[in-house]
Amino acid sequence: MKLSELLSTYSIETEFSNDFEVHALAELDKATPNDISYIDQARYLKLLKDSKAGAVFIRKKESSKVPKRMQALIVDNPHLAFAKASHAFKIPFFKNPESVSEPKHFKKVTIMPNVMIGEGVEIGENSLIYPGVVIADGVKIGKNCVLYPRVILYQNTILEDNVTIHAGSVIGGDGFGYAHTALGEHVKIEHVGIVRIQKNVEIGANTAIDRAVFGETLIKEGVKIDNLVQIGHNCVLGEHSIVVSQVGLSGSTTTGRNVVFGGQVGIGGHLHVGEFTQIGGKSAVGKDLPPNTNFAGAIPAMEIHEWHHFLAHLRTNFRKQQKTSLLQKAKGFFKS
Protein backbone atom coordinates (compact mmCIF):
# COMPACT_ATOMS: atom_id res chain seq x y z
CA MET A 1 0.00 0.00 0.00
CA LYS A 2 1.28 3.46 -0.95
CA LEU A 3 1.79 5.98 1.84
CA SER A 4 -0.74 8.33 0.24
CA GLU A 5 -3.37 5.56 0.15
CA LEU A 6 -2.70 4.61 3.77
CA LEU A 7 -3.08 8.18 5.01
CA SER A 8 -6.20 8.81 2.93
CA THR A 9 -7.97 5.55 3.79
CA TYR A 10 -7.57 6.00 7.53
CA SER A 11 -8.10 9.79 7.64
CA ILE A 12 -4.62 10.67 8.88
CA GLU A 13 -3.89 14.30 8.08
CA THR A 14 -0.23 15.05 7.46
CA GLU A 15 2.13 16.13 4.69
CA PHE A 16 4.74 13.96 2.99
CA SER A 17 7.28 14.25 0.18
CA ASN A 18 8.01 10.67 -0.90
CA ASP A 19 5.02 8.45 -1.67
CA PHE A 20 6.73 5.13 -0.99
CA GLU A 21 5.30 1.61 -0.71
CA VAL A 22 4.57 0.84 2.94
CA HIS A 23 5.16 -2.78 3.95
CA ALA A 24 4.53 -2.65 7.69
CA LEU A 25 4.46 -0.74 10.94
CA ALA A 26 7.50 -1.44 13.10
CA GLU A 27 9.52 -0.43 16.12
CA LEU A 28 12.12 2.23 15.37
CA ASP A 29 15.06 -0.07 16.05
CA LYS A 30 13.70 -2.85 13.83
CA ALA A 31 12.12 -0.85 10.99
CA THR A 32 13.21 -1.06 7.34
CA PRO A 33 13.03 1.75 4.74
CA ASN A 34 9.54 0.53 3.76
CA ASP A 35 8.20 0.66 7.32
CA ILE A 36 6.52 3.39 9.38
CA SER A 37 7.12 3.90 13.08
CA TYR A 38 6.03 6.52 15.62
CA ILE A 39 7.32 8.46 18.63
CA ASP A 40 4.90 9.38 21.38
CA GLN A 41 7.40 9.96 24.20
CA ALA A 42 10.56 12.08 24.19
CA ARG A 43 12.63 9.27 25.71
CA TYR A 44 12.47 7.40 22.38
CA LEU A 45 13.91 10.27 20.31
CA LYS A 46 17.40 8.82 20.77
CA LEU A 47 16.36 5.83 18.64
CA LEU A 48 15.89 8.02 15.56
CA LYS A 49 19.62 8.32 14.93
CA ASP A 50 20.13 4.67 13.99
CA SER A 51 16.63 3.83 12.78
CA LYS A 52 16.12 2.77 9.16
CA ALA A 53 12.39 3.56 9.12
CA GLY A 54 11.06 5.22 5.98
CA ALA A 55 8.80 7.55 7.96
CA VAL A 56 7.76 8.30 11.51
CA PHE A 57 4.62 9.82 13.03
CA ILE A 58 5.86 12.60 15.31
CA ARG A 59 4.78 15.89 16.90
CA LYS A 60 5.89 19.14 15.28
CA LYS A 61 7.95 20.25 18.30
CA GLU A 62 10.11 17.11 18.01
CA SER A 63 10.25 16.83 14.22
CA SER A 64 13.64 18.58 13.95
CA LYS A 65 15.18 15.45 15.46
CA VAL A 66 14.16 13.31 12.47
CA PRO A 67 17.13 12.44 10.17
CA LYS A 68 16.96 13.72 6.59
CA ARG A 69 16.77 10.17 5.21
CA MET A 70 13.47 9.65 7.07
CA GLN A 71 10.15 11.40 6.51
CA ALA A 72 8.62 13.22 9.47
CA LEU A 73 4.85 12.68 9.34
CA ILE A 74 3.80 15.53 11.62
CA VAL A 75 0.58 14.92 13.56
CA ASP A 76 -0.95 16.15 16.82
CA ASN A 77 -1.24 12.64 18.27
CA PRO A 78 1.35 10.14 16.94
CA HIS A 79 -0.12 7.27 18.97
CA LEU A 80 -3.57 7.86 17.47
CA ALA A 81 -2.15 8.09 13.93
CA PHE A 82 -0.30 4.83 14.49
CA ALA A 83 -3.48 3.16 15.79
CA LYS A 84 -5.43 4.22 12.70
CA ALA A 85 -2.67 3.06 10.35
CA SER A 86 -2.44 -0.32 12.10
CA HIS A 87 -5.84 -1.31 10.68
CA ALA A 88 -4.28 -1.58 7.22
CA PHE A 89 -2.12 -4.47 8.41
CA LYS A 90 -4.62 -6.54 10.38
CA ILE A 91 -3.97 -10.27 9.97
CA PRO A 92 -7.11 -12.43 9.69
CA PHE A 93 -7.67 -15.43 11.95
CA PHE A 94 -8.81 -17.46 8.95
CA LYS A 95 -8.10 -15.88 5.56
CA ASN A 96 -10.66 -18.17 3.92
CA PRO A 97 -13.09 -19.19 6.69
CA GLU A 98 -15.42 -20.96 4.28
CA SER A 99 -12.68 -23.45 3.37
CA VAL A 100 -11.76 -24.41 6.94
CA SER A 101 -12.64 -27.99 7.84
CA GLU A 102 -11.48 -30.81 10.06
CA PRO A 103 -7.87 -31.69 9.16
CA LYS A 104 -6.88 -34.86 7.33
CA HIS A 105 -3.38 -34.25 5.99
CA PHE A 106 -1.06 -34.40 9.01
CA LYS A 107 1.12 -37.51 9.36
CA LYS A 108 2.30 -39.00 12.67
CA VAL A 109 0.06 -36.55 14.53
CA THR A 110 -2.99 -37.54 16.58
CA ILE A 111 -5.87 -35.16 15.91
CA MET A 112 -9.18 -35.92 17.60
CA PRO A 113 -12.64 -34.93 16.27
CA ASN A 114 -13.95 -31.36 16.04
CA VAL A 115 -10.56 -29.74 15.59
CA MET A 116 -10.43 -26.78 13.17
CA ILE A 117 -7.15 -25.93 11.43
CA GLY A 118 -6.47 -23.01 9.08
CA GLU A 119 -4.18 -22.63 6.09
CA GLY A 120 -0.41 -22.97 6.22
CA VAL A 121 -0.35 -24.74 9.58
CA GLU A 122 2.58 -27.01 10.48
CA ILE A 123 2.41 -29.67 13.23
CA GLY A 124 5.41 -31.74 14.31
CA GLU A 125 5.50 -35.50 14.82
CA ASN A 126 3.96 -37.15 17.89
CA SER A 127 1.87 -34.12 18.78
CA LEU A 128 -1.58 -34.70 20.26
CA ILE A 129 -4.52 -32.38 19.56
CA TYR A 130 -7.66 -32.93 21.67
CA PRO A 131 -11.27 -32.18 20.60
CA GLY A 132 -12.40 -28.62 20.16
CA VAL A 133 -8.99 -27.11 19.53
CA VAL A 134 -8.92 -24.25 17.01
CA ILE A 135 -5.69 -23.43 15.16
CA ALA A 136 -5.61 -20.32 12.98
CA ASP A 137 -3.71 -19.69 9.76
CA GLY A 138 0.07 -19.87 9.78
CA VAL A 139 0.51 -21.51 13.18
CA LYS A 140 3.62 -23.64 13.65
CA ILE A 141 3.61 -26.43 16.25
CA GLY A 142 6.72 -28.44 17.05
CA LYS A 143 7.18 -32.10 17.94
CA ASN A 144 5.65 -33.79 21.00
CA CYS A 145 3.24 -30.97 21.76
CA VAL A 146 -0.09 -31.52 23.57
CA LEU A 147 -3.09 -29.21 23.15
CA TYR A 148 -5.96 -30.07 25.49
CA PRO A 149 -9.64 -29.42 24.63
CA ARG A 150 -10.68 -25.96 23.48
CA VAL A 151 -7.23 -24.46 23.29
CA ILE A 152 -7.17 -21.64 20.73
CA LEU A 153 -4.01 -20.65 18.85
CA TYR A 154 -4.35 -17.37 16.97
CA GLN A 155 -2.71 -16.64 13.63
CA ASN A 156 1.05 -17.20 13.23
CA THR A 157 1.60 -18.40 16.80
CA ILE A 158 4.74 -20.53 17.17
CA LEU A 159 5.08 -23.45 19.59
CA GLU A 160 8.47 -25.13 19.73
CA ASP A 161 8.94 -28.79 20.77
CA ASN A 162 7.45 -30.35 23.91
CA VAL A 163 4.92 -27.62 24.69
CA THR A 164 1.82 -28.55 26.69
CA ILE A 165 -1.20 -26.23 26.85
CA HIS A 166 -4.16 -27.12 29.06
CA ALA A 167 -7.86 -26.72 28.34
CA GLY A 168 -9.37 -23.38 27.46
CA SER A 169 -6.18 -21.36 27.11
CA VAL A 170 -5.94 -18.72 24.39
CA ILE A 171 -2.57 -17.98 22.83
CA GLY A 172 -2.05 -15.03 20.51
CA GLY A 173 -5.21 -12.97 20.96
CA ASP A 174 -4.95 -9.21 20.53
CA GLY A 175 -3.26 -7.29 23.31
CA PHE A 176 -5.21 -4.65 25.22
CA GLY A 177 -4.00 -1.63 23.29
CA TYR A 178 -5.92 1.54 22.39
CA ALA A 179 -5.15 5.12 21.43
CA HIS A 180 -7.49 7.91 22.47
CA THR A 181 -9.05 10.83 20.62
CA ALA A 182 -9.39 14.34 22.07
CA LEU A 183 -12.97 13.41 23.02
CA GLY A 184 -11.83 10.33 24.91
CA GLU A 185 -12.93 7.80 22.30
CA HIS A 186 -10.88 4.61 22.15
CA VAL A 187 -9.27 3.59 18.85
CA LYS A 188 -8.09 -0.02 18.70
CA ILE A 189 -4.48 -0.79 17.85
CA GLU A 190 -4.34 -3.85 15.63
CA HIS A 191 -1.65 -6.16 16.97
CA VAL A 192 0.35 -7.58 14.07
CA GLY A 193 3.04 -9.41 16.03
CA ILE A 194 3.00 -12.99 17.27
CA VAL A 195 3.44 -15.20 20.33
CA ARG A 196 6.44 -17.52 20.39
CA ILE A 197 6.60 -20.27 23.01
CA GLN A 198 9.93 -22.03 23.27
CA LYS A 199 10.49 -25.70 24.07
CA ASN A 200 9.53 -27.51 27.27
CA VAL A 201 6.93 -24.94 28.35
CA GLU A 202 3.72 -25.93 30.15
CA ILE A 203 0.71 -23.61 30.35
CA GLY A 204 -2.25 -24.22 32.65
CA ALA A 205 -5.97 -24.00 31.93
CA ASN A 206 -7.77 -20.78 30.97
CA THR A 207 -4.62 -18.71 30.61
CA ALA A 208 -4.31 -15.91 28.03
CA ILE A 209 -1.08 -14.83 26.36
CA ASP A 210 -1.51 -11.84 24.05
CA ARG A 211 0.21 -11.33 20.70
CA ALA A 212 2.72 -8.49 20.31
CA VAL A 213 1.86 -5.12 18.80
CA PHE A 214 4.75 -5.93 16.50
CA GLY A 215 7.56 -8.37 17.07
CA GLU A 216 7.02 -11.16 19.59
CA THR A 217 5.52 -11.93 22.95
CA LEU A 218 8.12 -14.48 24.06
CA ILE A 219 7.83 -17.30 26.57
CA LYS A 220 11.31 -18.77 26.88
CA GLU A 221 12.43 -22.35 27.39
CA GLY A 222 11.22 -24.27 30.43
CA VAL A 223 8.72 -21.70 31.73
CA LYS A 224 5.81 -23.10 33.77
CA ILE A 225 2.57 -21.10 33.88
CA ASP A 226 -0.37 -21.93 36.14
CA ASN A 227 -4.11 -21.61 35.46
CA LEU A 228 -5.87 -18.25 35.01
CA VAL A 229 -2.82 -16.15 34.18
CA GLN A 230 -2.87 -13.04 31.96
CA ILE A 231 0.30 -12.15 30.03
CA GLY A 232 0.12 -8.91 28.05
CA HIS A 233 1.49 -8.00 24.64
CA ASN A 234 5.26 -7.94 24.07
CA CYS A 235 6.09 -9.55 27.43
CA VAL A 236 9.24 -11.65 27.66
CA LEU A 237 9.40 -14.36 30.33
CA GLY A 238 12.93 -15.61 31.01
CA GLU A 239 13.98 -19.26 30.95
CA HIS A 240 12.57 -21.58 33.64
CA SER A 241 10.46 -18.89 35.29
CA ILE A 242 7.34 -19.86 37.25
CA VAL A 243 4.06 -17.94 37.12
CA VAL A 244 1.45 -18.98 39.70
CA SER A 245 -2.32 -18.67 39.29
CA GLN A 246 -4.05 -15.31 38.75
CA VAL A 247 -0.88 -13.35 38.01
CA GLY A 248 -1.29 -10.38 35.66
CA LEU A 249 1.66 -9.08 33.64
CA SER A 250 1.03 -5.79 31.85
CA GLY A 251 2.36 -5.20 28.35
CA SER A 252 6.13 -5.22 27.73
CA THR A 253 7.02 -6.70 31.11
CA THR A 254 10.35 -8.54 30.79
CA THR A 255 12.18 -10.87 33.15
CA GLY A 256 15.47 -12.63 33.55
CA ARG A 257 15.64 -16.40 34.01
CA ASN A 258 14.17 -18.34 36.95
CA VAL A 259 11.89 -15.58 38.19
CA VAL A 260 9.00 -16.71 40.43
CA PHE A 261 5.68 -14.83 40.52
CA GLY A 262 3.50 -15.85 43.48
CA GLY A 263 -0.28 -16.04 43.14
CA GLN A 264 -2.16 -12.86 42.21
CA VAL A 265 0.95 -10.75 41.66
CA GLY A 266 0.28 -7.71 39.49
CA ILE A 267 3.06 -5.93 37.61
CA GLY A 268 2.93 -2.64 35.71
CA GLY A 269 3.92 -2.38 32.07
CA HIS A 270 7.38 -1.72 30.62
CA LEU A 271 9.12 -3.01 33.78
CA HIS A 272 11.94 -5.53 34.18
CA VAL A 273 12.37 -8.18 36.86
CA GLY A 274 15.92 -9.43 37.31
CA GLU A 275 16.93 -13.09 37.18
CA PHE A 276 16.30 -15.41 40.14
CA THR A 277 14.05 -12.84 41.84
CA GLN A 278 10.96 -14.09 43.70
CA ILE A 279 7.80 -12.04 44.25
CA GLY A 280 5.40 -13.08 47.00
CA GLY A 281 1.68 -13.58 46.43
CA LYS A 282 -0.62 -10.56 46.01
CA SER A 283 2.33 -8.17 45.58
CA ALA A 284 1.89 -5.09 43.41
CA VAL A 285 5.00 -4.19 41.42
CA GLY A 286 5.40 -0.67 40.06
CA LYS A 287 9.15 -0.42 39.44
CA ASP A 288 12.03 -2.46 38.03
CA LEU A 289 13.23 -5.16 40.42
CA PRO A 290 16.90 -6.20 40.74
CA PRO A 291 18.13 -9.79 40.36
CA ASN A 292 18.56 -12.37 43.13
CA THR A 293 16.13 -10.69 45.51
CA ASN A 294 12.90 -11.67 47.28
CA PHE A 295 10.02 -9.19 47.31
CA ALA A 296 6.67 -9.16 49.07
CA GLY A 297 3.95 -6.71 50.05
CA ALA A 298 0.65 -5.58 48.71
CA ILE A 299 1.13 -1.95 47.62
CA PRO A 300 3.86 -1.55 46.61
CA ALA A 301 6.03 -4.65 46.65
CA MET A 302 9.24 -4.18 48.64
CA GLU A 303 12.23 -6.28 49.59
CA ILE A 304 10.99 -9.07 51.80
CA HIS A 305 13.01 -8.05 54.90
CA GLU A 306 11.57 -4.53 54.59
CA TRP A 307 8.09 -6.03 54.35
CA HIS A 308 8.65 -8.06 57.52
CA HIS A 309 9.93 -4.96 59.37
CA PHE A 310 6.96 -2.99 58.07
CA LEU A 311 4.50 -5.63 59.32
CA ALA A 312 6.24 -5.79 62.71
CA HIS A 313 6.16 -2.00 63.02
CA LEU A 314 2.51 -1.92 61.98
CA ARG A 315 1.62 -4.68 64.46
CA THR A 316 3.52 -3.01 67.33
CA ASN A 317 1.96 0.38 66.73
CA PHE A 318 -1.49 -1.16 66.42
CA ARG A 319 -1.09 -2.92 69.78
CA LYS A 320 0.16 0.29 71.40
CA GLN A 321 -2.84 2.11 70.02
CA GLN A 322 -5.16 -0.57 71.38
CA LYS A 323 -3.57 -0.33 74.85
CA THR A 324 -3.80 3.47 74.81
CA SER A 325 -7.44 3.27 73.81
CA LEU A 326 -8.20 0.81 76.64
CA LEU A 327 -6.40 3.01 79.21
CA GLN A 328 -8.35 6.04 78.07
CA LYS A 329 -11.60 4.12 78.37
CA ALA A 330 -10.61 2.89 81.85
CA LYS A 331 -9.75 6.41 83.02
CA GLY A 332 -13.08 7.63 81.74
CA PHE A 333 -14.88 4.82 83.60
CA PHE A 334 -13.23 5.58 86.96
CA LYS A 335 -13.81 9.32 86.57
CA SER A 336 -17.50 8.66 86.13
Curated annotation (Swiss-Prot):
It comes from Helicobacter pylori (strain HPAG1). GO terms for molecular function: N-acyltransferase activity. The keyword Lipid biosynthesis applies. GO terms for cellular component: membrane. Homotrimer. SUPFAM superfamilies: Trimeric LpxA-like enzymes. It catalyses: a UDP-3-O-[(3R)-3-hydroxyacyl]-alpha-D-glucosamine + a (3R)-hydroxyacyl-[ACP] = a UDP-2-N,3-O-bis[(3R)-3-hydroxyacyl]-alpha-D-glucosamine + holo-[ACP] + H(+). The keyword Transcription does not apply. The active site is at H233. GO terms for biological process: lipid A biosynthetic process. It comes from the Bacteria. The lineage of its organism: Bacteria, Pseudomonadati, Campylobacterota, Epsilonproteobacteria, Campylobacterales. The gene is lpxD. Pfam families: Hexapep (PF00132), LpxD (PF04613). Pathway: Bacterial outer membrane biogenesis; LPS lipid A biosynthesis. Belongs to the transferase hexapeptide repeat family. LpxD subfamily. Catalyzes the N-acylation of UDP-3-O-acylglucosamine using 3-hydroxyacyl-ACP as the acyl donor. Is involved in the biosynthesis of lipid A, a phosphorylated glycolipid that anchors the lipopolysaccharide to the outer membrane of the cell. Keywords: Acyltransferase, Lipid A biosynthesis, Lipid biosynthesis, Lipid metabolism, Repeat, Transferase. This is UDP-3-O-acylglucosamine N-acyltransferase. Its EC number is 2.3.1.191. Coiled coil: none annotated.
